[in-house]
Design a protein with these regions (language model features):
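Short, flexible, surface-exposed loop segments at domain boundaries
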Residues: 2-6, 17-208
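Repetitive helical segments and hydrophobic/amphipathic motifs
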Residues: 11-12, 133
Length: 208
């Protein structure tokens, strides 16, 4: 396993949500990215066995130079204008985005995945990677104004919205019972491989 490098990390974004909000992922084509969320059952140095969020056990082969990153809690007060963030959100009836979680990117990761796209955290969720242009009070918490190459968006962040950043980790985090998230590649034979694992650290679970 090579050492963690913030520059190398890419986020597919993103604490487990209530069971009612969980939906099975769409079948992935061979070599297509497959998001895996769950709890570690076993790690032997080369293979990770996970009880997935959807229920079935999943086995993930790890690349020889795989990396591990952890997450650390942050608060709304840690977000400032100019920060590059990822928000996973859903649209309210008024069309405004309501954040399910916010990730603060390290400066080295600015522009990672910039833009807005569908996400699979819950049905109809969106992921927006953008630069914070302003923060104002709102009836339901605070509103982040964010700007990306496609324009500007407003995201409501409630008082209970998980906010995290990424911190260095290593294989010692891959222990039974720890929560993980990864984006694995599905091979033609159905097996999964991954080069990066985001793992629970100091009790903070990946909110992806």
């Amino acid at each position: 396993m090579r050492k963690f490098s913030l520059v190398a990390v890419t986020i597919g974004v993103l604490f487990a949500l209530p069971a009612a909000a969980q939906v099975p992922p769409a079948p992935a084509a061979p070599d297509a990215p497959t998001r895996v969320r769950g709890t570690i059952e076993k790690f032997d140095g080369e293979t990770l066995t996970v009880k997935s969020r959807e229920g079935p056990q999943v086995t993930i082969g790890l690349a020889p130079n795989f990396t591990v990153v952890g997450v650390a809690k942050r608060s709304l007060g840690d977000i400032k204008a100019g920060d590059y963030v990822a928000s996973i959100s859903v649209k309210g009836t008024d069309g405004t985005l309501h954040a399910l979680e916010i990730h603060i990117f390290p400066e080295e990761m600015r522009r990672t995945g910039e833009g807005q796209r569908p996400h699979d955290l819950i049905p109809n969720s969106l992921m927006t990677n953008a630069t914070v242009s302003g923060i104002t009070a709102a009836p339901q918490g605070h509103m982040l104004k964010v700007t990306d190459k496609g324009g500007e968006a407003e995201v409501i962040v409630g008082p209970d919205t998980p906010i995290v950043t990424y911190v260095p980790g290593d294989a010692s985090l891959l222990k039974p019972g720890a929560a993980i998230f990864c984006i694995a590649q599905k091979k033609a034979d159905g097996s999964l491989t991954a080069a990066r694992i985001t793992a629970e650290k100091d009790g903070v679970k990946p909110p992806m």
